[in-house]
Amino acid sequence: PPALALGIEPFRNHLLDRKPVNRNASIITKSMIFTIIGNAFYITLILMLQSSINILNVAEAKGETVMFGIFAFSALFNAFNCREFNFDSIIPNLTKNKLALQIIGITAVAQIFFTQVFRDFFNAVPLSVMEWIKIIALSFTVIIVDEVVKFVFRLFKKENKNDENMPKVEA
C-alpha cells in the first residue's frame, strides 16, 4: 500500500529547475541505484546484527518475530526514503502527502495488530510494548542513515561545484 500512495506525491517545484532528461535515458539513475543498494545493505546489516548479537536484547524465543518486525518496519520507513529523487532530503516535503502518511500509519498499526492477534497464523510470539518500541526505533534509523548519506553527498557536490569555479593553476 505505501508504494501506491507514493504514486500520488504532490508536484515539486524544484523539478522544473532540472535539466531535461533524454527520452532514451534509463528511468533508474546512478543515484537511485546507489540509494537502493545502500538502504538494502543497511537493512541487511541491522537484521544480521539482531540475528547474531541480539542488539535489541530480546528473549531468544522472540527472535524470529522481532526479525520479522524489523524487516517489515524497515521496509515501511524506507518508503519515506523513496519519496525524493537523487540526493534530495525527504524532510522539506515529509508532511505534504497526507494520504501517504495515513497509509503508512495504518500499515504500521496493522503490522503490530496482525502480529499480535494472529500470531499462530504467522508463527509469531506476542511482543511487549517496549519490544515494539525498540523495533520501531531501530527500523527508523533507515531514514536517519539515508538522510546523513544524502547530506554528505550534497556537501561533496557543493564542494565540487566550488572547485570548478576556482581558477586553474598551471604548474
Role assignments for model-derived ranges:
Residues 1-171:
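C-terminal transmembrane helices and immediately adjacent loops/tails
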